[in-house]
Amino acid sequence: IAKLCDSDLVIDLTVEGLMHARETAAILKSGARIMTISNEHPGILSRLRPDPAMKEIVRSAVAACRAATRMKVTSPAGTDLTVAMTDIPTVGVWGWTDRPGTLAHWPGGLVVSFPRQASCNGSIVFAPGDINLTFKRYFESAVRCVIRDDFITEISGDGADAQLMKRYLDGFNDPLAFATSHVGWGL
């Protein structure tokens, strides 16, 4: 960790290794920048090169989230989720790190907010063709997740995708596996 803290730039090629590690805060506090290269196929990375225009797009989205009191997410598939947004941390990633003590990942272009406890309620419906990033595959059948006070309380669906998601989360044997950590979207 001391060597990482002494560096100007740390390139992270692990699968979400430093992004969620306890040591990250110390590395960033030292002034080092962490650039995470997402676990994607090289063909995807070659198509998603950093775009200088993305920085301002992300900053505008962050400003909109910080000014919002409520986020309402709906979809034709049936998603209907409400998130309280007042005075919560929101960050954006545009695909590169250009300031000391910051972490970014490539590909970038997203905004993420960290809601207060018991502030996410409703349902999220994953439709066939949506991407399940955890399993790096497309949903083949609809999956509905009911969220009450930040926790998934029900997972339903007719196909294997619902069972796969439920068994995966159950496998942690930890109620926090069903909790909302953050909300956001890609830009």
Would you name each region that the model predicts?
Residues 1-144, 148, 163, 174, ...:
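Active-site bordering "gate/hinge" segments
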Residues 138, 154-187:
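Dual-mode signal for accessory low-complexity, basic/Gly-rich regions
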